[in-house]
């Protein structure tokens, strides 16, 4: 990620790493690539971002993750939209890169389809050049620093869905959020099944907590998908009861012996 950020077509920007007690030589790698390394005492992404943001003095802030492959024109394609004063924040879709495994690309479906994510799609690609949207995932988005300061940055202590809550705060303050469908960020997915299922469990849990505190980020589809496990159990029970009621047997009688 740092290597590709260092080769961007946009000439002047600062790369900042908020390092929360990592054990993988993050400091050495960051300094090697000319990034600003901050030793962060936080224990979650929201607080880590706030720790870094409060030490920054820039007009625009771009966010991405350490498991992405930033296109070399990503910064340039993102910041150009802020020439329009109506743009409070802008982002783009993200998909599994071409070199990811078949299993990871299957997992990509869970992030990029409306049905599987209750309407919150990481891979949303609406038609148009710059399209209004209610949320951009934190892996590929940018905000005006003035707006971030106005809403007091991320919600402190938010253990998940912090990017969703931030976008809600930004819009509550009267600012508009857009998506550039062409500005795609390749984003590696966790491999099925155990790592991916753990991630999905955590997403569901944290989104449920966020929905209760910020009702405006919840939609009917979030509530509906919560009934999915009950529907599955009810379907299985109905099938079993139906088989019992119909005297179904795996070993049907062959009739009386002659």
Feature roles, as predicted:
Residues 19-27, 68-69:
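A conserved acidic beta->alpha catalytic loop
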Residues 61:
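Short aromatic/hydrophobic "clamp" motif used to bind/position activated sugar donors
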Residues 29-32, 40-56, 77, 131:
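Glycine-rich, basic loop-to-helix element that forms the pyrophosphate-binding segment
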Residues 3-12:
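Short, acidic, metal-binding catalytic loop of nucleotide-sugar glycosyltransferases
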């Amino acid at each position: 990620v740092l290597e590709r950020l260092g080769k961007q077509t946009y000439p002047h920007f600062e790369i900042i790493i908020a390092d929360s007690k990592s054990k993988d030589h993050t400091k050495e790698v960051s300094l090697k690539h000319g990034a600003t390394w901050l030793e962060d005492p936080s224990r979650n992404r929201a607080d880590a971002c706030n720790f870094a943001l409060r030490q920054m003095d820039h007009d625009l802030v771009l966010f991405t993750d350490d498991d992405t492959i930033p296109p070399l024109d990503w910064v340039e394609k993102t910041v150009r939209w802020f020439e329009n004063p109506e743009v409070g924040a802008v982002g783009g879709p993200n998909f599994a890169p071409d070199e990811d495994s078949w299993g990871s690309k299957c997992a990509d479906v869970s992030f990029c389809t409306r049905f599987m994510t209750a309407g919150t799609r990481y891979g949303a690609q609406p038609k148009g050049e710059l399209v209004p949207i209610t949320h951009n995932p934190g892996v590929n988005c940018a905000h005006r620093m003035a707006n971030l300061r106005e809403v007091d940055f991320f919600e402190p202590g938010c253990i998940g869905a912090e990017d969703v809550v931030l976008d809600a705060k930004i819009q509550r303050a009267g600012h508009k959020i857009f998506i550039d469908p062409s500005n795609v960020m390749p984003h590696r997915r966790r491999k099925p099944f155990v790592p991916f299922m753990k991630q999905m469990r955590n997403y569901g849990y944290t989104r449920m907590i966020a929905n209760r505190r910020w009702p405006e980020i919840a939609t009917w589809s979030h509530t509906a998908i919560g009934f999915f496990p009950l529907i599955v159990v009810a379907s299985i029970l109905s099938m079993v009861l139906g088989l019992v009621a119909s005297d179904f047997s795996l070993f049907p009688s062959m009739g009386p012996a002659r």
